[in-house]
Amino acid sequence: ALKTKGSALYLLGVRHDALGGSIVARFVGGDLEPLPAIDLTAVHREIALLREGYANGIVLGAHDISDGGLAVSICEMTFGARRRGLGVRIDSCERWAKDVGSAGAWFGEAGGFVVEIAATTAWEALARKHDVQPIRIGDVTDSGRVVLGESSFDAATLFDVWSAPLRGFYDATEEES
């Protein structure tokens, strides 16, 4: 869950213009596209960066990019903080994924992480040490909204939609809504 209004959000991991194997691809007919390539050496460096960042108090939180891509990962980060009124503002994908189409940027399931950072200068220095190029994509806000480029959604409404299929299976889900 998001921790602090005003903290920076960074992307680790390259976005690809491929939707192969993704949830979105199943709906738009692209499920037979190739899967995005995985650079295991880069992933190893990213995880080492996250571990040291957590140990030094620089990283406030992180979320993997997987099912549903970056857009879903960002939404999931807001769910635990929605009652505190926290939200996010993420820049247009044309800024942080210049050579990738918007579908691949937001919904491609190439690995990576969204990272909430307390101190950007220390984070960027630590990233250089680990030979990782994080990209600042946005900020944590007190708007209670998830703003993805030009699209804006109420975080509580997103949680209700996301958690609806779970109601009745998990008591905590009913209490949260």
Annotated model-derived regions:
Residues 1-38, 111, 119:
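Mobile "lid/hinge" segments at catalytic clefts and subdomain interfaces of large enzymes
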